[in-house]
Amino acid sequence: MSNHTGTIWNNTPNQVHRRTGPGTSYPIIDSLPPGQQLVVLCYSWGETETFTNPSGVTNTSAAWDFVVTSDQDAGGYMADVFIDTGGDISQQLGQSGTCEQLKQRLV
């Protein structure tokens, strides 16, 4: 598995929340601005979100990416639809890119 880079879409409303888990019911860790560069470490399936990107394409996905902004960042989950990774994160990282698989490898 390899990490993947991304950027928060520049037309997101204000700040995008990072959370402790893959859904809006999880506590907010912090909020990041549009245009923020990110590294996607893995993804999990969770609550479905919908967002229309600057090109006018509406994306709906239940993927939530575990993202960091630097090596010192503890990270958190952000709905994949708010992040421009250049494609579908589940295809880019594959089955081995799920956070569950990553946790198993780290144990």
Could you say what each language-model-derived stretch is?
Residues 1-3, 54-107:
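Boundary regions of SH3-family modules and the immediately adjacent low-complexity/disordered segments
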